[in-house]
């Protein structure tokens, strides 16, 4: 190749290659230091868009899982309260059965059973009025069509209603077991109340396992898969990147050496002129 004073083509090519290598080296260093292979849109416009959409869904699923966990806690609190109500109803039922045994009961015994039943019914109403999750009443009838956000997006929700379970709502607040006939009627009412509470507990159990926990399992599976996909797309593969960084360092060193050699051609021209 001839020597030229105005344009050193070899030097220009070497400078261009060195600039490209330096840029790639800087990008590789950024990936290694941040742990991300996509740090800005210029790194991969399409990849960044996909990654951000995945991050949005990951955030939504994480929030939904927390919502479900709180929902499970609320349902378990309500079911525990209903369990207490059921235990009290069984005690009331025992008193009604005892009062219905006319052959061995006198008026004093019937009155004592009635008084004891009254205390138990008051406890049932107290539990109904005071069972709460946080500040939310669960068993007083105000928990009606309450919404649970169980998915990552709008509309992915479900609702639950828990009926009032105080003595009046269970139609047992006015039972009278001071007579045999009254005790028999009370037994029918108490049995109906026990069935109502059992159905409510069954509904809560089905809602917890069939809706909340099943959805949580599905959300968790989606979350794990999305996190893996987002990581593969955005996170740095250190083994690959270190190899790339090492290779680029060598290219940069070679380009620097070539540039130095190319610039020596200008000195050759000066030497020739000096003769």
Show which residues each predicted segment covers.
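Primary detection of the long, small/polar-rich alpha-helical "axial" segments characteristic
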Residues: 1-275
């Amino acid at each position: 190749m001839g020597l030229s004073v105005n344009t050193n083509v070899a030097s220009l090519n070497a400078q261009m290659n060195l600039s490209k290598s330096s840029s790639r080296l800087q990008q590789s260093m950024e990936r290694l230091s941040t742990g991300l292979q996509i740090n800005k849109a210029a790194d991969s416009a399409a990849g960044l868009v996909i990654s951000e959409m995945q991050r949005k869904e990951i955030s939504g699923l994480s929030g939904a899982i927390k919502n479900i966990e709180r929902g499970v806690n609320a349902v378990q609190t309500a079911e525990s309260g209903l369990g207490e109500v059921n235990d009290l109803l069984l005690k009331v039922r025992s008193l009604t059965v005892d009062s219905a045994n006319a052959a061995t009961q006198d008026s004093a015994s019937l009155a004592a059973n009635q008084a004891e039943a009254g205390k138990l019914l008051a406890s049932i109403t107290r539990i109904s009025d005071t069972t709460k999750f946080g500040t939310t009443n669960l068993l007083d009838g105000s928990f009606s069509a309450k919404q649970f956000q169980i998915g990552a997006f709008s509309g992915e929700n479900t609702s639950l209603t828990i009926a009032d379970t105080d003595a009046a709502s269970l139609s047992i607040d006015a039972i009278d077991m001071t007579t045999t006939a009254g005790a028999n009627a009370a037994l029918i009412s108490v049995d109906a109340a026990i069935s109502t509470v059992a159905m409510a507990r069954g509904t809560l159990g089905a809602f917890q396992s069939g809706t909340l926990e099943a959805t949580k399992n599905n959300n968790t599976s989606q979350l794990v898969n999305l996190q893996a996909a987002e990581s593969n797309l955005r996170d740095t593969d250190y083994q690959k990147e270190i190899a790339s960084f090492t290779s680029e360092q060598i290219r940069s060193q070679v380009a620097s050496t070539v540039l130095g050699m190319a610039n020596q051609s200008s000195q050759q021209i000066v030497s020739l002129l000096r003769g």
